[in-house]
Design a protein with these regions (language model features):
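An amphipathic alpha-helical interaction segment
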Residues: 1-24, 41-44, 48, 52
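Basic, amphipathic alpha-helical hairpins
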Residues: 2-8, 22-37, 57, 61, ...
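…primarily DNA-binding HTH/wHTH and HhH modules…
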Residues: 3-15, 105-123
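Residue-level marker of regulatory loop/turn positions in helix-turn-helix DNA-binding domains and
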Residues: 12-16, 31, 35, 46, ...
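Short alpha-helical elements of helix-turn-helix
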Residues: 17-24, 68-75, 100
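Basic/polar phosphate-binding segments, predominantly the helix-turn-helix DNA-binding elements
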Residues: 39-69, 92-117
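Short, basic, alpha-helical segments at the C-terminal edge of helix-turn-helix-like DNA-binding modules
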Residues: 69-78, 117-123
Length: 123
């Protein structure tokens, strides 16, 4: 019996859109449960093996699932900062950050400014 090499799978823009949609649903779930977003829990949410999901996500988006999830959290926070008067602790919770300090740290890494300063600049 000869084993054939597996062809590398090609992912499309539609795959990325589905992943992003699943992340948005998961972040909504995190907000409803007041819990932090975690890769292992995201995999459970999708009923997938975490290692498989991580490998697949890297193939789809080119970065680790953790990094992509964090970027989506920051994008959601940006949207809420610029379109709502919500306080930062609510935005942190809604975007799936476990604590406000984690939110501030990640936001500063992404934008080199605090979320409040970002809101002022975007007014």
């Amino acid at each position: 019996m000869t084993l054939r090499a597996r062809k590398p799978r090609t992912f499309t823009h539609a795959h990325r859109q589905r992943l992003d949609h699943a992340i948005a649903l998961y972040l909504d779930e995190c907000y409803a449960n007041k819990s932090a977003a975690r890769v292992s829990e995201f995999a459970a949410f999708l009923k997938l093996n975490p290692e498989y999901l991580t490998r697949t996500a890297v193939s789809i988006v080119g970065v680790s699932l953790r990094e992509h999830l964090r970027r989506k959290q920051i994008e959601e926070a940006e949207r809420l900062i610029t379109t709502t008067p919500l306080p930062m602790y609510e935005i942190a919770l809604h975007a799936g950050f476990g604590t406000t300090s984690t939110f501030y740290r990640c936001f500063r890494q992404a934008h080199s400014m605090a979320p409040g300063a970002f809101r002022e600049v975007r007014k």
